[in-house]
């Protein structure tokens, strides 16, 4: 079979924070697939980089009193350390702030311009008069122009789900300085995604997407064929001051970070190609026969399935073979939380003494090819790792290796290796390979654990510890241990993409060459004696998990410290009279039912009891902070006399009160109000 040529990427982590376990879902998912492809003998390159440009990096560097370059260099070192700790096997890990990326950005931009796909337009934006800078969407907050909810970002309302432009906000303020922004016009550059050529191409390209959810989402964005295009042109420029690449021929204008970030995939590969003598153009040119896959989170599907392929298609590059999106991570059924200690950083996991392969295995046991979210249930994590990896898999070697080394000098009984159990394991190879290829890791590991159960059943039946007591059963002992260790070798082949360090330990003690998929058709040889068994993995101790949570838990005092130090908060509203306040009817309400709103990643639909003899329907933009299961049965506070509002999902008959920080990036979290014990539905608050 001819080896496939495959270029693989994961989304680029932003150079403004630490790697946490939510990030690791994607990198572990990608790495397992890449390691499997290498084991299959394919030529595969896995490249990544830090996403380094943009306003947040610039402002953080300013806050720390260092240059943006010093900041991104430090963060790169931290990110690379974390990826190495979790065995993420990049062939090249680079930075978007690299000369290769600058040149590629300029080349792609000029090619799109030559195709008449770049337009210059005047754009009115908010400008911070204190910081003397234009404000990106997420650095402006104010009141929603539709429902009036306060403290909403400049692009969308988390309460009613409305999207808008920043200049639509009422009473806006700068998250950076707290100042009231002014409106200013500026020339911006747009990629003309609405061009009929882009629409025609994207309708053809979407047909090859592997994930139905992604294809359906793209069809939703593209709209019905034959109707007017629903695609909007994309603003690819930002005004100085900005940390990034200046646009050719446009002084003071910079490429938007979301333009240069995906191009960073190619920049990293070009850097690798120069070092290894790879023909870069043969891999990424328009006639390339190589495969190209992007693993991403579902929140950035829009950029990777609309802008990125269209940019590549019309600038003279090949387009992605496919884009694979995954869901979000929750911990114990809830969004990761600093106060609960479940916002777990990669470094804290390692520092606590936790084995990275425990997490690799657990994530793999939960991952499939869909975009559904996955949950890290800590009790299940302990139980599954201890049961599957230690109790089932590692236990096979520990039960057989000692006898073989002590009684038979480590030499297997080759004649015994014709056992039907081993043929059963080998026959599973095509199915295991298919499941890895399809990214159905949970199914692959379920199958491998079924095979592991069969091997343990064999060991339990043969009872080598009993055979060892009777010298007349020496041959049976030799055969049982030989079959057990050969079975263990085959199981290790199947598990190697997930637990590569354990596999390396197995290779050493079994005295075999590095295992690849072809090793399934080989077997242990008496000419290469098995070495003394070395411990491969320890059990998870619940105390370690407790220590991990404690290490990541922030006290309320620590969380509040930035505000005390003078961080920007929403300005206090104008003074009102007691009569004004009396117009707002705040009531205690019980959450009777709660469910996610189909088609929205922000809203929850709540059924509330206000003691009126009927229930009310209320939509609330708190899905990022709570699961429906967490809210049912709780008491909360509602604006009861708010006029009903018709939304595309239904009518909302009130507003649930929730608190959040002015800068949710710096201090993430939404918190609904809960009355103390004793309050009952219908009580008025005043």
From Swiss-Prot:
A motif ('HIGH' region) lies at residues 13-23. Zn(2+) binds at residues 144, 147, 157, 160. Its EC number is 6.1.1.10. Its main location: cytoplasm. The keyword Ligase applies. One of its GO terms (biological process) is methionyl-tRNA aminoacylation. Residues 580-686 form the tRNA-binding domain. The keyword Ligase applies. Its cofactor is Zn(2+). It catalyses: tRNA(Met) + L-methionine + ATP = L-methionyl-tRNA(Met) + AMP + diphosphate. This is Methionine--tRNA ligase. The lineage of its organism: Bacteria, Pseudomonadati, Pseudomonadota, Betaproteobacteria, Burkholderiales.
